Amino acid sequence: MTIAEAEQANQQMTQRAAADGLEFRFDIIRGGNTFDAHRLLHLARDHGLQPQMKERLLRATFTEGLPIADPPTLVRLATQVGLPAGQAQAVLDGDAYAGAVRADEQQAARYGITGVPFFVADGKYAVSGAQPPEVLLRLLRRAYEDSSQLTPVAVTTDGNSQSSCDGDSCRTG
């Protein structure tokens, strides 16, 4: 992607975000390693606060230009969504959730994820990039339609399941 193409993509994302009431400030975004932020997302999940923490991190990054690789900033953001400061600090001081984040990274590699956003539905359908709602709706409908199809099975008298369909015919017992 050329610089001009990247600038155009950023402008399109900024316009889409603005249409949804979000402010993206690419001029103030600070780069940095987000590994610790992802570890705090796992802590937040354990407290039932993962969506709030994710939204807070995104706003801090894209709207406020905060350094989310900075541990004191991360602790402050965590407490703003209701996480105990001591627990957030303990995660950052140790290696808690490091394995979970590495597992997430490995799963992302298996999916072929190279950027965000990236949406996966039912573990097998995906779209990359900021997409309009109708694209995401098609993704969800496809995953739902495929997951709601039944595969008949018969249970033998010994309790073992076996496929009840062979070719074009199925048996019922």
Predicted features by range, described:
Residues M1-T61, D166, C170:
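Structural alpha/beta surface segment adjacent to cysteine/selenocysteine redox centers
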